[in-house]
Amino acid sequence: VDTCDEAALRRVFEKYDFGSVIHFAAYKAVGESVAEPLKYYRNNLASFMNVCALMKEFGRPNILFSSSATVYGEPDTLPVTEQTPRKPATSPYGNTKQMAEDILHDCCAAYEGLHGIALRYFNPIGAHPSALIGELPRGVPQNLVPYITQTAAGLRECLSIFGDDYDTPDGTCLRDYIDVVDLAKAHVAAVDRMTQRRMKEAYEIFNIGTGTPVSVLELVKGFERANGLTLNYKIVGRRAGDVKAV
């Protein structure tokens, strides 16, 4: 179902009796959002407003929103906490996450019985231990790890690292990487928190990360050491919308 299609989404609410919604439906490529902002504003915000409106109408009480650490913009200090002020986002993608958080906050404040949690992901990474679920995207990857693994497997000739002139120890961007299994467990815990009414407020925010930043080069070198191989990579210019560290 296209969640931008209100009529189609309404039929889902009419057919199924569910109390909680986890909202993942969004485009997420920072660079693409800079080139095609309207695509991101339409898909990421119109769909979310449809979900919120129907939850209000049908009396569905719990919504978990997939947010992002991009809402912190270019933070002044690391690590960021939930009390760190949001700063202007550096991309339309980040803007959509900030705006959706505001929408959810306002809806939870206005509509009695509606509860929401926003999980601010840092950088999901890895695969399920079964190896049956992992990062092998169709088309062009939007995350670093698939580029690394595809380069290692010979599917890509070279790995591009965007910028080595940032004010970081090795000049490449710093990111906080969170294992996807831990991220999945965080969603289960958040839904349980809502359904068991353990929330302190109708709307809450939680960061989902480790608190330890790793540079792009550190990740590449770590992959090389763990697998006993050398990756073919090159340094290219900075990518629009990227922040130095988060």
What are these regions (language model features)?
Residues 41, 89-98, 134-146, 176-177, ...:
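Short-chain dehydrogenase/reductase
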Residues 18-24, 65, 207:
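Rossmann-fold scaffold of SDR-type NAD(P)-dependent oxidoreductases
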Residues 74, 90-127, 146-156:
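Active-site Tyr-X1-5-Lys
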Residues 1-20:
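Conserved Rossmann-fold cofactor-binding substructure of NAD(P)-dependent oxidoreductases
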Residues 23, 49-92, 107-117:
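Conserved Rossmann-fold NAD(P)-dependent oxidoreductase catalytic core, especially the SDR/UDP-sugar
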Residues 12, 40-41, 55:
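A hydrophobic alpha-helix adjacent to the NAD(P)-binding/active-site core of NAD(P)-dependent oxidoreductases
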Residues 145-246:
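C-terminal substrate-binding subdomain of Rossmann-fold SDR/epimerase-dehydratase oxidoreductases
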